A protein has these predicted regions:
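A short coil-to-beta-strand element that immediately follows conserved catalytic motifs
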Residues: 28, 90-96
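Long, positively charged amphipathic alpha-helical accessory segments at protein N-termini or as interdomain linkers
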Residues: 21, 62-92, 102-243
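N-terminal lobe of the biotin/lipoate ligase/transferase fold
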Residues: 1-87, 149, 206-208
Length: 243
């Protein structure tokens, strides 16, 4: 696994996409302390907080469960990360298909895209900001280090190189490293889906943006049914996450 750590970068996602255009070997993880031009859903610019977690990960499709509908990758990975994040933030929940909420406030999100048999996912979390909804009420680098540790442990990557950056006050230089590949086995889509299905009711009162069909625009999630492949059903129309 190739690992890139940056003190500051325009976007972990665009950096990773550029690497894949050069036919880089998978898997690849890119993490940044600061991000100046992050990408949000539907190509919107991500408004970066004073302290946040920014990472992008590229995996080969062959490493994913066979029953995973790739169009629901954001929902799948969003839930996997949510389970780990709840160890520290139990009130977090996943709004369909890819937004992290704390109560009724959005504090982060996850987007996915496919490229050359790779699935690329980008994760952004607001840890602290006095203007934006966030996870913490004060600037705390140890919270960021703790969240990084959760992600690293979750992916089962070799922690030797990662441990060098967790003292975020003193470690300021960029880092490129190679470690052993992950030994993590991803759970089946059905396993993840049934867990999320039990919490889908939390979407009541919220809406989501869809980009196809006669209902193009915002639709109320409480008016929708959740299909087995992660899609929404509204009347006779079906909507996938497309994130």
């Amino acid at each position: 696994m190739r690992f890139y750590w940056f003190k500051e970068i325009p976007s972990t996602q665009t950096f990773l996409v550029d690497l894949l255009k050069q036919e880089a070997t998978l898997p690849i993880l890119v993490v940044a302390r600061n991000q100046t031009g992050g990408i949000g859903s539907r190509g919107n610019k991500w408004q970066s907080p004073k302290l946040g977690l920014y990472l992008s990960l590229a995996l080969h499709e062959s490493s994913l469960p066979r029953d995973l509908p790739l169009q629901s990758s954001a929902l799948y990975f969003g839930w996997l990360f949510l389970e780990r994040l709840r160890a520290q933030y139990p009130n977090l929940w996943l709004k369909w298909p890819n937004d992290y909420y704390k109560g009724d406030k959005k504090v982060g999100g996850l987007l996915t895209q496919s490229m050359r048999k790779a699935v690329i996912l980008g994760l952004g979390l607001n840890i602290f900001d006095d203007r934006l909804a966030c996870l913490c009420d004060q600037y705390d680098l140890q919270r960021l280090a703790s969240l990084l540790s959760v992600v690293i442990d979750f992916l089962s990557f070799d922690g030797i190189e990662f441990s060098r950056i967790l003292d975020l006050d003193s470690y300021t230089q960029d880092l490129v490293a190679t470690s052993r590949d992950s030994v993590f086995t991803f759970p089946s889509w059905q396993c993840v889906f049934h867990k999320y299905q039990q919490e889908f009711h939390k979407n009541r009162g919220f809406s989501t943006h869809v980009m196809e069909g006669t209902s193009r625009g915002y639709i109320r999630l409480e008016d929708c049914l959740l299909r087995e492949d992660g899609a929404l059903v509204l009347g006779d129309e079906v909507f996938y996450s497309r994130r």
